Amino acid sequence: MDDNRKKALTAALSQIERQFGKGAVMRMGEQPREIIPSVSTGSLGLDIALGIGGLPYGRIVEIYGPESSGKTTLTLQVIAEAQRQGKTCAFVDAEHALDPIYAEKLGVNIDQLLVSQPDTGEQALEIADMLVRSGAVDVIIIDSVAALTPKAEIEGEMGDSHVGLQARLMSQALRKLTGSVKQANCLMIFINQIRMKIGVMFGSPETTTGGNALKFYASVRLDIRRVGSVKEGEEVVGNETRVKVVKNKVSPPFKQADFQIMYGRGIYRTGEIIDLGVKEGFVDKSGAWYSYKGDKIGQGKANSSRYLEEHPEIAVEIETAIREKLMPKTPVKEKEAPVAPVEAE
């Protein structure tokens, strides 16, 4: 860069610093390279598919899928994992359908969980905005976008046409929220439902509610589906679930994870550790018997999983080995490097 352009840049940077404060503009290379903080989803396979070990703090996430596919269960597992990290969590229940007994079974500390059941979409998003701006809440769930009914629609009569009201509401709210979420390092998860587009000849007719704004503002989008049933004899005891990472701004996208959600228990984590352990060679399988480091841990997956539940230190050991093998190496956090503003020369 020649001297005249360098002087012009220096003058501009000095003016920006005076007007907007120190650190308003920085050279990217002078910032410390930090590992993106994340919270586990409760599923080992999904944590690996997401690339950073879970859902990222300081970002907006969308989880969508058909009815009874496990959307709320997955978010409650995220809350349980975040609470184990000592985080504060809030649940904005626009559907008025949160079951505290089920949440407690999944490991959620309901005494520490903040819950709101707002009357209108505007109220729900305003409450979420105030919680984010407080800087004291780490995880906020909004269940669901489809239930964020605009005030005009609630006060109107049945059958009244309110074209695009919800989409405009979401677009305006996300413009306000996205910066606050980053500054507060808060994870905001929107649960969404699926609708069908009429007259689609080619491609998928499915779309999500609330317009296109959330598709753009979300750093991670997860498509969750029930692909089968888990049976014990003739009794159905859970769902076979598949989650596709359809958008990911923090790691390579388009990966998927398969796991089981057991009724009344949530994600079948030990079963997942057994399956991935066998696949990656950490757990040996001979016929129906499973063994780890030469010691038999059980006959059949159910007995082996029960053994891991009774010996959590072995489950943690296998899980750590799987994560170290499958998770990409992340850059080491440079603690000494300060966030330096561009200085005038």
From Swiss-Prot:
Name of the encoding gene:
recA
GO CC terms in record: cytosol
What organism is the protein native to? Hahella chejuensis (strain KCTC 2396)
* Similarity annotation: Belongs to the RecA family.
Q: List ligand-binding residues for ATP.
A: 65-72
One GO term (biological process)? DNA repair
The identity of this protein, by name, is Protein RecA
Which PROSITE patterns would you find in this protein's record? Answer: RECA_1, RECA_2, RECA_3
User: InterPro entries attached here?
Assistant: AAA+_ATPase (IPR003593), DNA_recomb/repair_RecA (IPR013765), DNA_recomb/repair_RecA_CS (IPR020584), P-loop_NTPase (IPR027417), RecA-like_C (IPR049261), RecA-like_N (IPR049428), RecA_ATP-bd (IPR020588), RecA_C_sf (IPR023400)
Question: Which lineage do the record's taxonomy fields give for this organism?
Answer: Bacteria, Pseudomonadati, Pseudomonadota, Gammaproteobacteria, Oceanospirillales
Q: Tell me which domain of life the UniProt entry assigns to the organism this sequence originates from.
A: Bacteria
Subcellular location per UniProt equals:
Cytoplasm
Q: Does the keyword Phosphoprotein apply?
A: no
Q: Name one GO molecular function term.
A: damaged DNA binding
Q: Give UniProt keywords alphabetically.
A: ATP-binding, Cytoplasm, DNA damage, DNA recombination, DNA repair, DNA-binding, Nucleotide-binding, SOS response
| Entry function | Can catalyze the hydrolysis of ATP in the presence of single-stranded DNA, the ATP-dependent uptake of single-stranded DNA by duplex DNA, and the ATP-dependent hybridization of homologous single-stranded DNAs. It interacts with LexA causing its activation and leading to its autocatalytic cleavage.
